[in-house]
């Protein structure tokens, strides 16, 4: 069976811009989406970590989903973050999102804070997938959620017909094992920009990226080089990207991305608390590395 995300190797985990009144700035948001698509991005993850999902209200998320579909207008895939550590609420919210025409899939994070075991997480994702009108992309990010799905658990979930991919933010070894053993129609993405070369070179699906806000063309060139068997060029592209990735994650995300946009002439506002904006010295340090 063909996966609807097949050949979607670069997705941006897009920021949520805010205006001076701390409301979502949809005019700037539309500009970002158009620019990203022009630069080669093939999809977007909305209301994820980089999109400041924890500080967005339910109504803000729904409006953001609707506006995204309108702005994208079929030019790229749209994946929306609907997950939480409450299975019932996740099902209800995913169903609500599923009533918006143009959304391709839902990103569901591993349950945080309540720390279920592997059996509990398998039950969580299976129950959501059974009820969801949208295909599910698992978001396995133990660095933020504490709970980590093992390779064995992910392979069990990969057999569910409504679970189509994983955004894997874990070790190189786990990612490699998933790529090796997952069904062919189950896609293994990395959510770590620093794993982008390794993931794609090993046969993974690509990257759900933060650095692609500024380096989408470089990511696209790297993936194209790998597709063409030119690993020397791809490695060079990655060596260019990698130190810039480190700089963009030198402070809590998405504060660096927002600071760089503002310094570059696009005011996307500041993060909502508890993430603080960067000061001038912090931004200067990042800009010296990025050289935009």
From Swiss-Prot:
PROSITE patterns: DHDPS_2
Active-site residues from the entry: 139 (proton donor/acceptor), 167 (schiff-base intermediate with substrate)
Site (Part of a proton relay during catalysis): 49, 113
Gene3D superfamilies per the UniProt record, alphabetical: Aldolase class I
SMART domains on file: DHDPS (SM01130)
CDD domains (alphabetical): DHDPS
Subunit field text: Homotetramer; dimer of dimers.
Protein name: 4-hydroxy-tetrahydrodipicolinate synthase
Species whose genome carries this gene: Oenococcus oeni (strain ATCC BAA-331 / PSU-1)
Gene name tied to this protein: dapA
